Amino acid sequence: MADDLGDEWWTQGDNSDVPEVEEETEHAEEKQPIKSTPKKRKVEKQIPDATKKKKATVKKECFITQERSEEKPDNESNKNKKRRKKKKTITDVLTSSKPVPGSPVDLVSLLKTYHSQTRSVIEQEELTLQDSCFLSCNDLTHSLSSYLKEVCPKWAKMQKQHTQTSSVVLLIVCGSALRTIDLIKQLVTFKGQAKVLKLFAKHIKVEEQIKSLSKGVTHIAVGTPGRICALLEKEGLTVQGLRYLVLDWNYRDQKQRRMVDVPEVKGDLLKMMDQGLIQSCREGTVKIGLF
């Protein structure tokens, strides 16, 4: 059997073995780079990925810090702009300015601007206060008692002659209830035997004040323009026996505001003046003093 096969078997066997070896070598060669390359690639991919992430985070942190550093000066500049744009209040203006004593011109101009909105030109002329309507003004050196002694030299005589109820001889107008109490304390050396009444809205009803004015003779009243205006409107207080109207013009509160610097108080003061006080001043029966 072996002889019959002859050389062909061997040749075929030899030829058949060669390609198998070649195929195996080729497969081995093909397998080696496939196995080696992915391993190398995996290692190469893992290392740069980690480093790249670190570098990216570092770069991001750098950019964030740069952005924050760039934002800070912008915020500071915006704050400075806001500070610059802040408007001055009345308190800031008044504290920076020197106190100037009030004059008759101040009250006349205030009444003129008020009446120009609601009155005709002819009516405005009839409501204009002349210089003869005013007493000498406080030059910021007087206390209340010393000022009243100067402008009311015959106070003792006038006090005795006053017999009317629901009326006073001296009416002092100020901006608040606390200031009212303070001024009443300052009247001790001036008032003598005169009866003093406080007129403000805090804890005291209008009806109670009307009763107290009608019961007996009151010589001096100190109060706020809002309550005095309400009493004049209800005729609980009249101007028949009134001779002196003193406005607490120059006093400044904790915020450096005068009575006419507070809008509500100023409005009440102007309304109060229209309740027969301007007319009495023009007739010469009442004199105005700016303390």
From Swiss-Prot:
Transmembrane segments: none annotated. InterPro entries: Cms1, P-loop_NTPase. It comes from the Eukaryota. Residues 17-27 have a biased composition (Acidic residues). It holds the Pfam family CMS1. Residues 58-79 have a biased composition (Basic and acidic residues). Residues 1-96 are annotated as: Disordered. Belongs to the CMS1 family. This is Protein CMSS1.
